Design a protein with these regions (language model features):
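Conserved beta-strand segments that form the floor/walls of ligand-binding pockets within enzyme
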Residues: 15, 110, 128-130, 187, ...
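Conserved SAM/SAH cofactor-binding pocket of Class I
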Residues: 133, 137-220, 227
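N-terminal auxiliary segments of SAM/dcSAM-dependent transferases
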Residues: 11, 17-120
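Conserved beta-strand segments of alpha/beta enzyme cores
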Residues: 40, 81-83, 110, 182, ...
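S-adenosylmethionine
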Residues: 188-299
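Surface-exposed loop/turn positions
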Residues: 107-109, 159, 209, 255
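SAM-dependent Rossmann-like transferase core, predominantly class I methyltransferases
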Residues: 90-156
């Protein structure tokens, strides 16, 4: 899974990485995002630890990076080894392109990088992303699960749609293209908002998708759009649990919530948090170690 700023350079880059337990994942992701153009995190199935790595200009923002990591170490009670490796921009971009071919997802979608010049797969809805900053979006199990879940509930024709923690904007764009509806998309990170807006524009969806920075459900702009018929939240298990009450409050009586960013072993925990607020399981989808949940109100 990745979040992105902008990495479009012809100069040398470096990759900075740490390996941390799950409870510290969000903290170290935020620390690297403060100075890195793109950040990804990857689960080691054998150890249960997470590799968090970011790409930035080589030697740039050193004081800020060291300060962010020191504060994060103190907050997490950890001192993970910080590893660095030089990464040439041209080589990094070439590897990213080669690792990001067209990716068919489910029955309807295909995810394409901007570097691809051939025609999209026939009979599928293309969603175009900048491969340089969106690597991790299309092939990640949580994203694929959300897109499959969207196909599953499309027959309900939801009208009011929210993508919470939009990242690259991929889920809002897929919903707008499949359902021909408007959508709201939010993210707490300013760079994610910029990236999502760029992707929305390159997909010709600016009239349909409105992207703004928001901290979860606290923003009036988010709340005024409620109740929502469809809510995406492809984030992580802990914030999903924290926001369960708000999701229940602002989800329409017959609405559906598509939640992901959680591992299969976290399903019971996340479900328990949402059941306390009257939401029940409608469907579960699996992609590798990742799970996607479709939830509804108990009366829906």
């Amino acid at each position: 899974m990745s979040r992105a700023g902008e990495v479009r350079h012809a100069t040398a880059l470096e990759t900075v990485s740490v390996t941390v337990p799950e409870h510290a994942l969000e903290l170290y992701e935020a620390a690297l995002l403060s100075v890195c153009g793109t950040v990804g995190f990857f689960l080691d199935d054998d150890t249960g630890l997470w590799l968090v790595e970011g790409v930035k200009d080589q030697g740039a923002h050193e004081p800020e990076l060291l300060a962010a990591l020191a504060l994060t170490d103190a907050a997490a009670g950890l001192q993970p080894l910080v590893q660095r490796r030089p990464t040439h921009a041209d080589g990094w971009l070439a590897r990213t392109h080669s690792a990001f071919p067209e990716q068919p997802v489910g029955r309807r979608f295909t995810i394409r990088g901007t570097h691809l010049t051939d025609a999209a797969l026939p009979g599928r809805i293309p969603v175009v992303l900048d491969a340089a900053i969106a690597f991790g979006s299309g092939e990640h199990g949580s994203t694929r699960g959300c897109l499959r879940a969207l196909e599953r509930i499309a027959y309900r024709q939801p009208k009011r749609i929210l993508d919470m923690g939009t990242g690259t904007g991929i889920l809002a764009m897929a919903a707008a293209k499949l359902l021909h509806r408007t959508a709201k998309a939010t993210d707490i990170e300013p760079w994610s908002v910029r990236v999502a807006r760029e992707n929305v524009g390159r997909n010709g969806l600016t009239p349909l998708i409105h992207v703004r920075r928001a901290d979860g459900w606290s923003a009036p702009w988010v709340v005024t759009g409620a109740p929502y018929d469809l809510v995406f939240a492809n984030i992580l298990a802990r914030p999903l649990c924290r926001m369960a009450g708000s999701l229940s409050r602002y989800l329409a009586p017959n609405g559906r919530a598509i939640l992901s960013g959680l591992l299969q072993r976290q399903v019971r925990w996340v479900l328990s948090a949402h059941r306390q607020h009257g939401l029940v399981l409608d469907a579960t989808l699996h992609e590798g170690a990742w799970a996607t949940l479709v939830l509804r109100h108990g009366c829906g």
